[in-house]
């Protein structure tokens, strides 16, 4: 087992370590996901994955990392290699079909309710992105979707340097932001034309995005 990161929780100084997850961790993954869902007041904020979906990722179609206190899984984060279909997020950000195989998705991220407030989301995001960039340049783009007004997830994506490229209906009609981060030639954008717009002005945001603007902070 290769330890990718070691740290201590800010709240109680408990040491934790981060490793890659495999199929042998699937029971712990499902158990932690159930705990996280049960603790949510608004259960629609999280789209849980099924056992089959986790297995698909762990069988070589993505990457999962987990944080452990001794042998207890307290947080995990996943990346998914998506199927090439009409719903592919690469199409939403304007990529040609020939480049869709260069896209990987940020998938689910869960932290045990007792371990929140320790910056685990950010730590796991940094670790998994570092691991991804070691993957022999197989991927050029990371994409994901976030529901409007899911403030923690929006903050999480912006903190990673991801940008909103589209706002459109996905997954059977639900409005979603489509985020993207380019993995190569990663330099800060020097924004020359900046517009501020209210979060509840969806049509105004869509108009700006269609003109080539990107959402970069809130």
Region locations from a protein language model:
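Short amphipathic alpha-helix that is part of the acyltransferase structural core
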Residues: 2-52, 59, 64-69, 73, ...
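Conserved acetyl-CoA-binding loop-helix of GNAT-fold acetyltransferases
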Residues: 105-113, 117-133, 159
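C-terminal "cap" of GNAT-fold acetyltransferases
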Residues: 170-198
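Conserved acyl-donor/pantetheine-binding loop and adjacent beta-alpha core of acyl/acetyltransferases
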Residues: 75-108
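Conserved GNAT acetyl-CoA-binding A-motif
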Residues: 132-148
